[in-house]
Design a protein with these regions (language model features):
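Q-loop/switch helix immediately C-terminal to the Walker
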Residues: 80, 87-107
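Catalytic Walker B motif of ABC-type/P-loop ATPase nucleotide-binding domains
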Residues: 161-165
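Conserved ABC transporter NBD signature motif
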Residues: 51-65, 70, 125
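ABC ATPase NBD coupling module
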Residues: 61-80, 112, 221
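Helix-to-loop junction immediately C-terminal to a conserved catalytic motif
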Residues: 46
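Conserved ABC ATPase signature
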Residues: 136-140, 144
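Conserved ABC ATPase "signature" region
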Residues: 106-131
Length: 233
């Protein structure tokens, strides 16, 4: 069953109109050169960018009209992480659950963060020590911040995970940990610069100069097709 559908959706100058169905529980990798449109496609899929042609449907409804619980079912791990540096690890993790709670709960998170036990649980899942709970994010290393962003995503409990270059600048061990956690989610669309990892996924999408030019199982993608996808021609 398709949970996310793009019908001739596009962004002038960035993405040519495309048709795409992301199915429930499916692990999909998005490949292509820098500037091919991968980040723009992720933005269309989570609603942070609005298609100027066609439409995007989430659970059968226009994504731009989705609110509340339905919209919160899409979680995104951005390449720039989008953490609040001045807040603690727990406060940043709890922000993943803001949509499920009241404004009062959100204000409390800024003053006396609740749900510390839940925070510790998701921190353990991403390999962060409990001692980091009340530590400002600004004091953490790049790899530690990546884990905080992933913990925030897990706290959100999304039905579909979108990730924009989540493995860039990570050492091999951390990259493997992050990829395993993302693939363990119910369904995902992950943008990567690592075609060597495509066999970890069920489906491969390829973007070239803003056009969707590949959509197949990893076993069907040839060396020649990958070379063309990343070529200058």
């Amino acid at each position: 069953m398709a949970v996310l559908e793009l019908h001739r959706a596009g962004l002038t100058g960035r993405l040519q109109p495309l048709d795409l169905r992301i199915n429930d529980g499916e692990a999909t990798v998005l490949l292509g050169r820098s500037g091919a449109g991968k980040t723009s496609l992720i933005g269309l899929c989570n609603g942070s960018l609005l298609a100027d042609q066609g439409q995007v449907l989430w659970q059968g409804q226009p994504l731009r009209r989705c609110r509340g619980a339905l919209r919160r079912q899409i979680g995104t791990l951005w390449q720039d992480l989008r953490l609040v540096e001045e807040l603690t690890v727990l406060q940043n993790i709890n922000s993943g659950a803001l949509g499920r709670h009241s404004l009062l709960w959100g204000l409390r998170n800024l003053i006396n963060p609740p749900d510390q036990s839940i925070g510790r649980q998701v921190m353990a899942r991403v390999g962060l020590p409990p001692s980091f709970l009340h530590q400002p994010v600004s004091t953490l290393s790049g790899g530690e911040r990546q884990r905080v962003a992933l913990a925030r995503l897990l706290r959100q409990q999304p039905a579909l995970v979108l990730a924009d270059e989540p493995l860039s600048a990570l050492d091999p061990r951390l990259a493997e940990d992050v990829l395993n956690l993302l693939l363990a989610q119910h369904g995902c669309l992950i943008s990567l610069h690592r075609p060597d990892l495509m066999h970890r996924f069920q489906r491969v999408l390829g973007l070239r100069q803003g056009a969707l030019v590949l959509d197949a199982a990893p076993s069907a993608i040839t060396t020649e097709a990958l070379a063309w996808l990343y070529s200058d021609d």
